[in-house]
């Protein structure tokens, strides 16, 4: 599966693969007068990773200085993803995030930042008309903006928001022997991923890897029980938790193309693979039967 020549450094990386999926996304720039308000808007609007339950999910790509934004204010770039090509549902879900998490924050604006678009969404229908017919349009840095009048004047959003196609659900597990490694190594990983333009980690440090098979189908994906350390003795031979492993956090990555996803996986694993408290690195998959793509961990680590 992996490369024939495996670097000694990657001896603790399992020769396995992760599955990833096609998805549509939009890449937005949110600006605000105040840094705390900006952070609240960007983090609130990306807080719930809902793709596995048929909702939208997002993540923060990075922050932008005032001199690099269209309105010369503090900015942050976020991605919002949907795992279906139901554009009407995507538009509605996106509007909820914008209306309930951004529009309601004082002095915020939203600009399109999607490169290589496949199409666009008219934001008047589900966001602009929050102005109840009193909304209007104006230019900001040669961009067509909808102005929604609010009690703290005013919210602005670019009229056309582009969307494109990318890769979602790339993942790996870093199996830890010590509790502190879960967060310590996880922070290092997330910081490394943030250095790669075009990718997000929608769950941050994820403590609950899931599986498709379930005893309760109305819930959706449930806990991946063979990889729960607390069930190792109870499951006996069914358990897949390696000896010495007490915690199995997961990192999920969405990216605008294969190149940036692979770079993010590589730099993330490289950032922690030498830690003594990380026993093994592996990945989640569905035997190659569910995702649109299969990516070998060792191929990525040896080729990028």
Where are these predicted regions, by residue range?
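Conserved mixed alpha/beta catalytic, RNA-binding, or beta-rich assembly cores of soluble enzyme
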Residues: 2-69, 80, 87, 92-250, ...
């Amino acid at each position: 599966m992996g490369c024939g020549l495996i670097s000694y450094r990657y001896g603790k990386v399992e020769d396995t693969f992760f599955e990833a999926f096609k998805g549509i996304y939009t890449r937005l720039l949110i600006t605000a007068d105040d840094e705390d308000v900006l952070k609240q808007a960007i983090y609130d609007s990306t807080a719930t990773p809902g793709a596995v339950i048929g909702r939208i999910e997002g993540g923060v790509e990075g922050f932008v200085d005032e001199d690099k934004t269209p309105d010369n204010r503090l900015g942050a770039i976020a991605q919002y993803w949907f795992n279906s090509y139901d554009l009407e549902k995507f538009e509605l879900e996106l509007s909820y995030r914008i209306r309930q998490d951004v529009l309601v924050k004082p002095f915020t604006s939203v600009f399109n930042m999607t490169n290589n678009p496949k199409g666009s969404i008219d934001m008047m229908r589900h966001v602009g008309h929050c102005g109840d017919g009193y909304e209007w349009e104006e230019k900001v840095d040669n961009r067509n903006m909808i102005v929604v009048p609010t009690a703290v004047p005013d919210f602005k959003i670019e009229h056309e928001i582009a969307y494109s196609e990318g890769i979602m659900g790339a993942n790996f597990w870093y199996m830890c022997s010590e509790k502190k490694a879960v967060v310590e190594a996880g922070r290092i990983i997330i910081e490394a991923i943030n250095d790669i333009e075009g990718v997000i980690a929608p769950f941050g440090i994820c403590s609950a890897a899931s599986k498709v098979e379930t005893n309760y189908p109305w819930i959706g994906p449930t806990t991946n029980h063979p990889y729960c350390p607390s069930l190792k003795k109870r499951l006996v031979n069914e358990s897949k938790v390696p000896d010495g492993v007490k915690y199995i956090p997961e990192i999920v990555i969405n990216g605008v193309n294969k190149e940036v996803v692979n770079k993010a996986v590589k730099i993330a694993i490289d950032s922690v693979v030498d830690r003594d408290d990380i026993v093994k690195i592996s990945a989640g998959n569905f035997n190659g039967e569910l995702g649109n793509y299969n990516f070998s961990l060792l191929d990525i680590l040896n080729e990028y």
